[in-house]
Amino acid sequence: MKRKWEIEKLKDTKQFKKSADMILRNRIESLLSYIEKYFKDLSVESLHDVRIALRRVRYSMELFIICYDKKIFIKFYNKVQLLQDLSGNVRDVDISLENINYLVADNHIKIENDIILKANEKKFLLEEKFKLELMKFT
């Protein structure tokens, strides 16, 4: 079945395949490098770099599906998509915590420690799941 992002009139020429190989290799190598950095420094910035690299791999893949065996390609694409979703979940909690901290500081209000504690617990669990999937990927 054709995916919504497949471009119907693209042709699988030798030059196009060669370009696809070069671009995807570059994008995947870059992603692996950012994943390695993420494991050394579990910061918001390194998570952001991994998220950008995942996006670049995924969107490049969408252009080049016609160049590869569709079954294998989609399996790899789905792994990249899962990692992108998981990294987004971690980022969502980071943003929530930033917003809570901003509201507290800016409005001089107090909130229950339980809220921050629960958000941090959720972040920890999501990060662990994300790291596990990254390890499987690499």
Place the predicted regions along the sequence by residue.
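Cationic, histidine-enriched alpha-helical/coil surfaces that engage anionic ligands
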Residues: 1-138
